[in-house]
Design a protein with these regions (language model features):
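Short glycine-aspartate micro-motif
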Residues: 27-31, 88, 185-189
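Active-site neighborhood for divalent-cation/phosphate handling
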Residues: 6-8, 49-59, 68-174, 270-272
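N-terminal phosphate-binding loop and adjacent alpha-helix
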Residues: 50-79, 217-231, 237-240
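Glycine-rich phosphate-binding/hydrolytic loop that grips phosphoryl groups
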Residues: 263-296
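Short glycine-rich, Thr/Ser-proximal phosphate-binding strand/loop in the N-terminal lobe
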Residues: 34-64, 202-217
Length: 296
């Protein structure tokens, strides 16, 4: 018996300022994961005016998000609008690596990923590259051919930019770091049983990695390991929390035992949110906001 998948978004923010007939100077930001899909619209004034968050937790292991997306797109006022100034698609996957620009060779992109994964990419995937020009490195990540083809068909002759989720987080935390009064800062982004750790020092990205964990004890161990690896005392730098974490979560309770400088993060100042976003926790959608800040 086929699994029934709920197509209604768990979170929806719409503003009266969004006009689907005037998208030529607006940016459509989409984030795609194994069982989730999110969208954000940055309008002509640089303001985030729409947000939707879909979660397809009932997808079985042999089902793919691509099988659900056509139903989400069908008759969707925003997704079927256009043409857009740009469409930015964040890929939320476990396979990525950052390569310093002087060492990067395009013909070795798949090899970089194979070295990181410990195995070759499967036939239905390829290595995609995004350049962080201001920071002097490139992000290499896996992208599925069917997913790439689907978005290319949905938005023909429109500028598509594919990035890894970590690239959006790098962009968002770079914006936060530029306005920070401290010499260094650590940013933690939580999602399901993963945490992405970013460490900025002297306005340079010194560390970026993603860890999977099964319990909060493992989570605390990984964070303390990173601090030790970077020669940082537990209270030496402020640590900002983003994503799926709350003051009442088990993860927060465990981390607060060891880390005295925890705080919940804020929206990057480079992106303005419409008043309708006021009910959302500021720290919740950092990767989506980072897509809105790309190239800023």
């Amino acid at each position: 018996m086929p699994t029934t998948v709920t197509l209604a978004p768990k979170t929806t923010i719409r503003t009266y300022s969004f006009d689907p007939g005037k998208t030529g100077k607006s940016v459509l930001c989409l984030e795609v994961g194994q069982d989730r899909f999110q969208l954000l619209v940055r309008d002509t004034g640089g303001q985030a005016s729409c947000l939707e968050d879909y979660r397809f937790s009932s997808l079985s292991t042999d089902q793919s998000l691509l099988g659900v997306l056509p139903d989400v797109f069908r008759n969707h006022e925003i997704l079927l609008a256009g043409p857009w100034q740009e469409i930015r698609i964040g890929i939320n996957s476990a396979s990525f690596t950052l390569i310093p620009e002087p060492l990067f060779r395009k013909e070795y992109a798949a090899s970089y990923l194979a070295l990181m994964r410990g195995s070759l990419l499967p036939p239905h995937e390829f290595a995609q590259v995004y350049a962080h020009k201001a920071d002097g490195f490139l992000s290499v990540f896996n992208l599925e051919h069917p997913l790439f083809n689907y978005f290319s068909e949905m938005y023909p002759l429109q500028p598509l930019v594919f990035v890894h989720q970590t690239s959006a987080l790098i962009q968002a935390t770079a914006d936060l770091d530029r306005r920070s009064l401290t010499a260094g800062s650590i940013y933690l982004y939580f999602e399901d049983e993963f945490v992405t750790v970013l460490y900025w020092k002297g306005h340079q990205l010194r560390y970026c990695n993603r860890f999977g964990y099964k319990n909060v004890q493992d989570l605390a161990y990984y964070i303390l390991y990173v601090l030790d690896e970077q020669s940082l005392a537990a209270g030496a730098v402020p640590i900002s929390l983003f994503g799926e974490i709350t003051p009442f979560s088990e993860a927060y309770s465990e981390l607060s035992r060891f880390l005295p400088s925890l705080s919940f993060g804020t929206v990057p100042a480079g992106l303005t949110l419409a008043p309708e976003f006021s009910d959302l926790p500021d720290h919740r959608y950092l990767s989506l906001y980072g897509l809105g800040l790309l190239n800023e």
